[in-house]
Amino acid sequence: MSSILSADDLNDFISPGAVCIKPIKVDKTTENAEIEIGAQGQALEVGIDGTQKELEPAQLSLSDCLACSGCITSAESVLVALQSHTQLLDELKKEAELPSGEKRIFVCSVSHQARASFAAAFGVSVEVADAKLHSLLLDTLGFDYVVGMGVGREISLIHSAQEVEKSTQKPVMAASCPGWVCYVEKTHPHVIPYLSSVKSPQQICGSLLKKVICDTRRVKPSQVYHVSVMPCFDKKLEASRDEFSVEEAGQEEKIRDVDCVITTKEVVQLLTEKDMSFGGLPEIDKSRLYTSVPETWPAERDWANHVGSSSGGYLHHVLTALRLRHDPLETRTRVDASMGKNQDVMEYSVIDTETGETVASAAQVYGFRNIQNLVRKLKPSRGKGKVVSARKSTKTVSAALNPSTYSYIEVMACPGGCINGGGQVGAPEGVAAREWKDETEKMYNSIPSEAVSEEVVDWATKVWGPHDEDKLVTAHYQEVEKVDQGLASTW
């Protein structure tokens, strides 16, 4: 387990179960035998005739976790270290030993939140942090390409707004947070129909990067190794979902769209293990900054920010689309905002100033404590297909929150949203968590913003093919069947 991953790093931590209940296949011997521990610490099966057989350790992958209902969200963080910076270093070490004709192409995508965290942690601008990160990835580690997450995010935002506009069921709930998605699939399957079917920027980026590189470099998906730098450990679980991978002839296992996810703080630990520091990294030449991207990749759109929350701006973009549909010139509507019992519950309403009518409304719900309140109000009432009505209250939004009235809800598992993810660089000693979150968010908001453009979607459609666009942008969710612990093997 990674030394930087602990319960202290997890927001709204949910304690893991005492044992993992994932059944493990055991090959039992037909003869009498005993288990002994060898001199080197290995487990040995010793037969009555004195013969010894070394036993293989039980192994558990992230994919196993996603298919098991034994634990949820935070508990799985005990296992996400299996996909970590050490895995990346191992892959780079293996690559260095290969002949030039057999080397893979390494590409890294970097989230906006991670860039802001680096800048806040080391007291530099986001542009300087980007220049140092480019230097680390391209010159020190030997990556071929470095891209931002802007292209994937623009596509995700546009399709999210289109989905809400077409939906006949309220609410549509953001599904870009894998911690939230796992929680729903394993404990509240009645919420699955409300989840947005649009992939996250990480996965859209992963699909497009492998497609573009394979087409322009004439290689197979297995010859491209894609790393994402993200603010959240649960993003490792998302990358491990079976649907986000492709089959390739000659390969025993499917090839993932995102091969490895490392968090912001894991990048810092990687540097420490290499006797380096982020502050000591040189800044890459400006001619290579933001331009070391695959051929045909729209670099000019890739590093820009978007208006809205530091969790990706989903609510802002969706609500703006709904407002423009009613009021194209934005001259006879206003947006009202109301805070709930805490800063992580917000309600936004588009009001027609001429009639006083509420044209559209949306909510922002962050943190598991608030999510649990939300989920309870989505439970079907007995004998009816409608959600449970919220209790009347004039005190706070959260007390009166009625999910069925919202067109869209931006849901994130971490209090404060993605900018405050468990994988971000932590607050310095003496700095309060809320103050540090605000400082990181200030860095995030300093990234220049651009309006979301359909041009990126048009480009992606040409690259991907118009008939297969569904595979590029659509995700699927399903209930994870509960395992009977009484029948499962424990170890």
Swiss-Prot record:
It comes from the Eukaryota. [4Fe-4S] cluster 1 binds at residues 20, 65, 68, 71. One of its GO terms (biological process) is iron-sulfur cluster assembly. [4Fe-4S] cluster 2 binds at residues 177, 232, 414, 418. GO terms for molecular function: 4 iron, 4 sulfur cluster binding; iron-sulfur cluster binding; metal ion binding. Component of the cytosolic Fe/S protein assembly machinery. Required for maturation of extramitochondrial Fe/S proteins. May play a role in the transfer of pre-assembled Fe/S clusters to target apoproteins. PANTHER family: NITRATE, FORMATE, IRON DEHYDROGENASE. This is Cytosolic Fe-S cluster assembly factor NAR1.
